[in-house]
């Protein structure tokens, strides 16, 4: 979540970021990986001047992208069958060390450069084993580009390679070698260690998020069967967290670490995602693998239906999450829809007069992982995360149809349960359509007939308009008085909306508060959703800064994630951050604090400046309704001063899992989540 604006401080601008770029090569994975396999395309000069072109941003996302680039190289070694363990360590001084047990970056001289291959890989853009075709058959990330970019954007890089019977080292400063490659003692071990320190003059922050890295590494471990990825945080802050809930002194010196290793690969991934979904429709995960060696194309699919109402199909190409789908997803969906309908009719589960099940009916409650690996992927779409290779659709459709036909024939009882669930979804869809038709006739879902309680803005330019979703009439009244009516709309809602995690679409559309939001946004919902019709480019959830307020926000986010996900993916959803305290030094001298820590810091700074504070000088806001219109305007609504958190979606599978835990039926999973994360909560307002 990215913050912008603050009445008390200047924050860095919102980090927009872009998705990882991807490059791969064709060739025989068993081909030699030596200096001759390294090819050079262009120089590295521009990277420090325009880092955003290479890593997307210089904010948090770009910083974590550096780690990803180095780890991608190690994963390439695993994909080629030469590595099975990757160790990532966040060092006490903020550096990051990545170690793998692969073959080691070659140290021989690259003929065209007259330098050791490892130095070329680290100092020349687009120099890497994938481009010439001799090093990797399939690879993900930006191998070659990534490591040299990491070098260019770091104050210091140290590389250690074990290869050709020796240990070799070299160091770099601001992308330039400080000395020649040095050969050390003989060793039979192989592998590469890259340690780097991101440049604080380039990045807005050099503080890595353990959670962000661990989520991505867990996903990578799921997608690379048998690969072990260890993440360790040696920073003092992590040590303090690790021992914060322990009585003994020794525990305070523990480091924070996680290890991910899945022999079942994506089968374990599906099991993990479905473990929070409640009852399963069938006990075993359906899995299949296939390969077309002539086309350097392979496929893995794992899938299982649960008793929930939402679809969770996630696709990957060369381990890169294809957020926008593509030909592999199209092939999967086409095979699934045609086969399930054919099977249902052959087994008389669908009668002659019944309509075919739609793809949405069939995929209700389905959790599936589709992972393809190919030599030359073509990426399309707005964020270059949509696979475009036409040959992939044909391959996936044929393989899924054949394997799933066999599974259905061998498991007739489970097959019948799957189809019955699809039929129930179809009945709900028909009921929802009738409900939509009825509400459309009444004008309840149409933006042409806006909800009566909406205080709309005057502008018709969606890019400038924003809507505040405010809980409670009193807060809604203050918000109406404090808004800029030219660009700011207010929609008050009453109480907590329906928990959509536990309801089908037909029931959801009957909820008045949800009807009001759908109508106000103008996009439609679910299968009728059209983001081009969005009336406000900022949707701001404004709730009290207490537990009830956070619960309301979670309910709203669950609805938006499940039924209007493109709003979240496109960065249109924000959380307001109203202050918790008002500190009054005098009649016209006051400051706002957004946490207990900030309150204490402001009071201490005031005392040091000689300011006097009375006992009644610190006002605690228990709700938005306690603020007058002017206070709400200054702290929460004024675009120049407010603090907003942008809701971003870097990992849909992880977000899906989190919403299932927080809002689903599994009470034990929710309790375990709270216990596991309680030590990370510094200020709990109950």
Swiss-Prot record:
Region span, Disordered: 1-29
Enzyme Commission number(s) of this protein: 5.6.2.2
Keyword Manganese applies: no
Biased composition (Polar residues): 1-27
SMART domains hit by this protein: HATPase_c (SM00387), TOP2c (SM00433)
Biological-process GO terms, alphabetical: DNA topological change; DNA-templated DNA replication
Catalytic activity: ATP-dependent breakage, passage and rejoining of double-stranded DNA
Cited InterPro entries: DNA_gyrase_B_C, GyrB, HATPase_C_sf, Ribosomal_Su5_D2-typ_SF, Ribsml_uS5_D2-typ_fold_subgr, Topo_IIA, Topo_IIA-like_dom_sf, Topo_IIA_B
Leading EC class: isomerase
Binding site for Mg(2+) 2: 544, 546
CDD domains: HATPase_GyrB-like (cd16928), TopoII_Trans_DNA_gyrase (cd00822), TOPRIM_TopoIIA_GyrB (cd03366)
Principal location class: cytoplasm
Cofactor: Mg(2+); Mn(2+); Ca(2+)
Toprim domain boundaries: 465-579
Compartments, record wording: Cytoplasm
Positions with a binding annotation for Mg(2+) 1: 471, 544
Cofactor, how bound (note): Binds two Mg(2+) per subunit. The magnesium ions form salt bridges with both the protein and the DNA. Can also accept other divalent metal cations, such as Mn(2+) or Ca(2+).
Record family assignment: Belongs to the type II topoisomerase GyrB family.
Job of this protein: A type II topoisomerase that negatively supercoils closed circular double-stranded (ds) DNA in an ATP-dependent manner to modulate DNA topology and maintain chromosomes in an underwound state. Negative supercoiling favors strand separation, and DNA replication, transcription, recombination and repair, all of which involve strand separation. Also able to catalyze the interconversion of other topological isomers of dsDNA rings, including catenanes and knotted rings. Type II topoisomerases break and join 2 DNA strands simultaneously in an ATP-dependent manner.
HAMAP family: GyrB
Note: Few gyrases are as efficient as E.coli at forming negative supercoils. Not all organisms have 2 type II topoisomerases; in organisms with a single type II topoisomerase this enzyme also has to decatenate newly replicated chromosomes.
UniProt subunit comment: Heterotetramer, composed of two GyrA and two GyrB chains. In the heterotetramer, GyrA contains the active site tyrosine that forms a transient covalent intermediate with DNA, while GyrB binds cofactors and catalyzes ATP hydrolysis.
Record-given protein name: DNA gyrase subunit B
